[in-house]
Amino acid sequence: LETFQPVHPGEARVYSCGPTVYNYQHIGNMRAYVFADTLGRVLSYKGYKLTHVINITDVGHLTSDADAGEDKMEKMAASQGKSAWDIAAFYQADFEADLARLNIRKPAHPKATEYVDAMIAWGKEIAEKHCYELDSGLYFDVSTVPEYGRLARAVTDDGEGRIEEVDGKRNKADFAIWRKTPEGETRQMEWDSPWGRGAPGWHLECSV
């Protein structure tokens, strides 16, 4: 066990990786938020000023969960004949209703699409020392961070199980910071960037 030592005395910050709002949440999804809410309540009870953030992934999560495939938002939008923005709004509202039904205190809900400019800025900041570009996008080189994976006790030689092999990647565990829109395609959710038109990868979304 370790003694909890906040960065700022009297304050505690809890970040929960939020849902990809392309479909309804199931009980396994919600379990994580019950745990985080319980932690937050204990911290509040102990007198800490709590900030709890659950991000909303409304772009950039691919169907394989392994850094490859179609964007889940775009795929669901096409199947329902709606825009990706409409899909995101509908399922975010349903997720928030689920939180209320479970008596989970309402956290802050920043949406990924509201912070794309900040994501691009952060990508530019780390690109020179930590990233490399392929035809498919900008990738983070995990070998540039000697202690990468320490917090999760990950073994980088084996890689992370849900990260896909991509031609040209330097390391199996390297992941996409920015995914370029394939030539000849147009997506509903895409932005201009120094690495071409496309969308952020979900690792970049969570870190920003």
Q: For the regions a protein language model found, what residue spans apply to each?
A:
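NTP-dependent nucleotidyl-transfer catalytic core
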Residues: 1-208
